[in-house]
């Protein structure tokens, strides 16, 4: 998660409980929230940490709209889903049981999602290299891109 999100600041977490009929319509989150000291946090990445075991409720999927189509998530308790905050998302109606989640937002060192994804891909390639000149050049490229794209 750290190499994909590159967090520099976190919002305060929020907790949500959805019972039967509970849902949250498709929306986009605020561009800025505040941390525990009242300082603004640019919301580059949203996260949902699932606290209820998926077997204890029906419905209540996290719906994320993606250019490739809608994706629904109902992972096991303790799992988190991260996605770019600007993507439309919502929660489908709960039909049985209770859905408990923790949600929050991350300000990334790298503002743009496409740049974060490119860096993540390069680091995955780098992790498969044994070393040598090619690995050094890849490390240099990743570092230079971070200096070029990184913000505080």
Predicted feature residues:
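Fe(II)/2-oxoglutarate oxygenase catalytic core
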Residues: 1-46, 51-80, 86, 92-152
